[in-house]
Amino acid sequence: YKFNNQREPLMFLDAIYGDKNIYSTPRDMMKWDYALSKDQLFAEKTLEEAFKGYSHERRGTRNYGLGWRLVEMPSGKKIIYHNGWWHGNNTVFSRLPADSTAIIVLGNKFNRSIYQAKKIAGIFKGYGIQSDDDE
């Protein structure tokens, strides 16, 4: 459904799998994060290359790796993430590998406020994202 409770119509891109139409649960996303952090799916060297910035799309901390968006903090810490949306659903999947943490938020009705989940990283030291509670 759309934000105004209208049904999303089917369209030709609905049959593209891998780019869209991947449905999951928070538990499955947690397993995915665990597998990435324990080198169960890919070699450590492969992940190092995937999580390295190549595009330097914006001056400063924002970058794009191989299929992953990156925020590279001056502290040396990284937020590795990829958000998603399609036809009324949207997701936030962020990894804070230095703190063995994943932020996973899945929504079944498109709502831009879901992307505010990035502020959770501000709980951890060295990410430079300030929450209202920071001193």
Predicted regions and their residues:
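Catalytic loop of the DD-peptidase/beta-lactamase superfamily, centered on the K-T-G motif
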Residues: 4-135
